[in-house]
């Protein structure tokens, strides 16, 4: 009883899979050139990736902060560092060392 049922299911599965393999893909599926891009589009992607990747780490390269040296000076002064926690770095630096 089980063997004929199993054979029938296998035959049905074979017919379904064979029918799907023989069928030609439709226009939406074929997507002429969907796996490929033009040279111009490809070079734009590569340029974009090169611009934003750090070559050693493979991660986006951070933009240098122009205020980082001043922030370190303020952090080394305990009074400036404490004031920066309350009113912000730029205002604390201005009060201790002059304009930013």
From Swiss-Prot:
One of its GO terms (biological process) is cognition. Residues 24-51 form a propeptide. Residues 1-23 form the signal peptide. Residues 52-98 form the Gla domain. Ca(2+) 2 binds at residues 72, 75. Ca(2+) 1 binds at residue 68. GO terms for cellular component: cytoplasm; extracellular region. InterPro entries: GLA-like_dom_SF, GLA_domain, Osteocalcin, Osteocalcin/MGP. The gene is BGLAP. The modification 4-carboxyglutamate is found at residues 68, 72, 75. Ca(2+) 3 binds at residues 75, 81. The modification 4-hydroxyproline is found at residue 60. The keyword ATP-binding does not apply. This is Osteocalcin. It is found in: Secreted.
């Amino acid at each position: 009883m089980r063997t004929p049922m199993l054979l029938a299911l296998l035959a049905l599965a074979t017919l379904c899979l064979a029918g799907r393999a023989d069928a030609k893909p439709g226009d939406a599926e074929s997507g002429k050139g969907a796996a490929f891009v033009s040279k111009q589009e490809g070079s734009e992607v590569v340029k974009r990736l090169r611009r934003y990747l750090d070559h050693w780490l493979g991660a986006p390269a951070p933009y240098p902060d122009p205020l980082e040296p001043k922030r370190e000076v303020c952090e080394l002064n305990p009074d400036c560092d404490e004031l920066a926690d309350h009113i912000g770095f730029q205002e604390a630096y201005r009060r201790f060392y002059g304009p930013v």
